[in-house]
Amino acid sequence: MSYTTRIPAKLLARQAEDGRMTRREFMKFCGIVAVAMGMGPGFAPAVAEALQAKGRPSVVYMHGAECTGCTEGLLRSIDPFIDILMMEVISLDYCETVMAAAGRAAHHALEDALRNPAGYVCTIEGAIPTRKGGVYGQVGGETMLSLFSRVASGAKAVIAMGTCASFGGIQAAAPNPSGAIGVREALAPFGIQPINIAGCPPNPVNYIGTVVHLLTKGMPELDSAGRPKMFYGTTVHDQCERRKHFNADEFAPGFESKEAREGWCLHKLGCRGPYTYNNCPTAQFNQVNWPVRAGAPCIGCSEPGFWDALAPFNKDVRQKSDKA
């Protein structure tokens, strides 16, 4: 099993040459998104048509209570590289992490983005502090609760990026002094129902695939937790390459063991794959690797209640289910 991730030399050479996406690279990206959406590679032309005909969708990317890990995951996308993604696939009109503006200039950039006549997709990364009126989380003197409700109310669609935004995540872990909660719960009084792209961090393909689905088919079908079924419709366990060892009752006794390196099941080392819905085994990260293949048990990071409900990690705290 591979424990390393290497960026293909040809990909680096192409990026160093001029940073532009060729037609072939663009269609490859569309194919990756189409497969992740469950449509198959044959849907790639439709994805390409949507992105080209409708123009690059404007994205207003807000940051709440978070570690910026979801943005970091997106920034480390290599197929395509993030600059190609921002300049040729979406129009990232506001994002505090990567924008040059700061202070009042950043505030003006946000207000300009909100006046876009073509509309915009609002993405919120991070939980929203609500205790004492939300004073524990502010941007430019305005509480995140107030600002995000205002930005989200005018959006064509709202996407909660990551588990903190989806369900509160580690920001809502006990004792949760700021009263942090997920976007859906925080903005429900304003009639806002976001699409939850859960994960810590989520796969960038799931985010881009959701944007493409909004362009091509409108609102995707969501599960009971507000996640797109096309990405979160199957458990990690049912897609895992180690599943055959689970069926054979072959469980790795330790992380350093020969059995773990040979691909035996990590369930007794705390793997939450049987209880976690995500497409990590098929989408992988940068189409190269994912935690369980690399030897780390799934910790259920895309599930409601993560962090508290699934701790302690790396311990077999549940019995093997007959349904697993």
UniProtKB/Swiss-Prot annotation:
Residues that hold [3Fe-4S] cluster according to the record: C280, C298, C301
Enzyme nomenclature, EC number: 1.12.2.1
Single GO biological process annotation from the record: anaerobic respiration
Enzyme kind, highest EC tier: oxidoreductase
Keyword Secreted in record: no
SUPFAM superfamilies: HydA/Nqo6-like (SSF56770)
Binding site for [4Fe-4S] cluster 1: C67, C70, C164, C200
Domain of life: Bacteria
Catalyzed reactions: 2 Fe(III)-[cytochrome c3] + H2 = 2 Fe(II)-[cytochrome c3] + 2 H(+)
Binding note for cofactor: Binds 1 [3Fe-4S] cluster. Binds 2 [4Fe-4S] clusters.
Binding site for [4Fe-4S] cluster 2: H237, C240, C265, C271
Main subcellular location of this protein, as a coarse class: periplasm
Post-translational modification comment from the UniProt entry: Predicted to be exported by the Tat system. The position of the signal peptide cleavage has not been experimentally proven.
UniProt-recorded Gene Ontology molecular function terms: 3 iron, 4 sulfur cluster binding; 4 iron, 4 sulfur cluster binding; cytochrome-c3 hydrogenase activity; electron transfer activity; ferredoxin hydrogenase activity; metal ion binding
Cofactor(s) this protein cannot do without: [3Fe-4S] cluster; [4Fe-4S] cluster
InterPro entries found in the cross-reference section: Cytochrome-c3_hydrogenase_C, NADH_UbQ_OxRdtase-like_20kDa, NiFe-Hase_small_C_sf, NiFe_Hase_small_N_sf, NiFe_hydrogenase_ssu, TAT_signal, TAT_signal_bac_arc
Keyword vocabulary terms for this entry: 3Fe-4S, 4Fe-4S, Iron, Iron-sulfur, Metal-binding, Oxidoreductase, Periplasm, Signal
Claim: Iron is one of the keywords in the record: yes
Leader sequence segment: 1-49
GO cellular component: [Ni-Fe] hydrogenase complex; ferredoxin hydrogenase complex; membrane; periplasmic space
Compartments reported by the entry: Periplasm
Record-stated family: Belongs to the [NiFe]/[NiFeSe] hydrogenase small subunit family.
Subunit structure: Heterodimer of a large and a small subunit.
Protein name: Periplasmic [NiFe] hydrogenase small subunit 2
Species: Nitratidesulfovibrio vulgaris (strain ATCC 29579 / DSM 644 / CCUG 34227 / NCIMB 8303 / VKM B-1760 / Hildenborough) (Desulfovibrio vulgaris)
